[in-house]
Swiss-Prot record:
PROSITE patterns hit by this protein: RHODANESE_3
Active site as annotated: C177 (cysteine persulfide intermediate)
Catalytic reactions of this protein: uridine(34) in tRNA + AH2 + O2 = 5-hydroxyuridine(34) in tRNA + A + H2O
Pfam entry (one): Rhodanese
Protein's name according to its UniProt entry: tRNA uridine(34) hydroxylase
Function noted in UniProt: Catalyzes oxygen-dependent 5-hydroxyuridine (ho5U) modification at position 34 in tRNAs.
Gene Ontology molecular functions: oxidoreductase activity, acting on paired donors, with incorporation or reduction of molecular oxygen
UniProt keyword Iron present: no
């Protein structure tokens, strides 16, 4: 039996987010749903996996809360469950930019996946990858800018430095990330710096793959995922991953030692 993998987020005020945690955890465990849900006062961010029936029940359960109803989510499939347990975490920030009291409500404009290729192919558009370097090493859009960050908290420093030579020209900026949440927050930061023409890929890379299949081959390589699939290709099929030490192919079932994109097979892990 295959598994459905669902990725979703929403920026919404959840004053009682700490009370939601045990309720969601219990529901997921009872319905054999695994993955990670992050709750903060700013909203919800999650990747979960289970049967289609279980996930249908989950989203119907969320619909009971007006703040979380009608969530749009990305759906893909996996032969094995890419998660070993269910985690519901509480965070100060939904996605950590490292700036206190930052208001990300005024973010950039969406570009639909079907229009993305034409948009980033324009000579007057700067395409910025808001992911971390270890993710970008697996794949990226052609000619996109790599901020060379190790974590999302590094992005503001890079953006401030990059803006020094660009802000007066007010260029067109296109931003993207895995599922959409980081580029939504980073576009708000770029607008806060003074850029006015800021856009981002709706639904992120995963939705782009699902909607377009990378028909124009503007995506190069794989997309890193934050689960045991590690990487997926533009057809959302888990990729062929190699151990960083011995170069041996690592099967999905053996990919249990993963840290920031570094994959170790069990044999090498025993000797590290």
């Amino acid at each position: 039996m295959g598994y459905v993998v669902s990725t979703f987020y929403r920026f919404v005020h959840l004053s009682n987010y700490y009370d939601i945690r045990p309720v969601l955890k219990e529901f997921c465990v009872q319905n054999n749903i695994k993955g990670t849900i992050i709750l903060a006062e700013q909203g919800i961010n999650a990747t979960i996996a289970g049967s289609q029936n279980s996930l249908d029940k989950f989203f119907s359960f969320l619909d009971l809360d007006s703040r979380l109803c009608n969530l749009q989510y990305h759906k893909s499939f996996s032969r094995c469950n890419p998660f070993s347990k269910m985690k519901v975490k509480l965070r100060k920030e939904l996605v950590c930019l490292g700036i206190e009291d930052f208001d990300n409500s005024v973010s950039g404009e969406y570009i639909d996946p079907e229009n993305w290729d034409n948009f980033i192919s324009r000579s007057d558009v700067y395409t910025i990858d808001t992911r971390n370097s270890y993710e970008i090493n697996f794949g990226k859009f052609k000619n996109s800018i790599n901020p060379e960050t190790n974590c999302f908290r590094d992005f503001p420093d890079w953006a401030i430095s990059w803006a020094k030579n660009k802000i007066d020209d007010d260029p067109i900026i296109a931003m993207y990330c895995t599922g959409g949440i980081r580029c939504e927050k980073s576009t708000a930061f770029m607008k806060d710096l003074g850029f006015s023409k800021v856009y981002h890929l709706k639904g992120g890379i995963l939705e782009y793959f699902k909607s377009t299949g990378n028909i124009n081959n503007l995506w190069e390589g794989y997309c890193f995922t934050f689960d045991d699939r590690i990487i997926v290709d533009d057809k959302l099929v888990p990729g062929d991953v190699k151990c960083i030490l011995c170069g041996a192919h690592v099967m999905l079932e053996d990919m249990k030692s993963i840290s920031r994109g570094h994959v170790l097979c069990f044999s090498c892990k025993d000797h590290v």
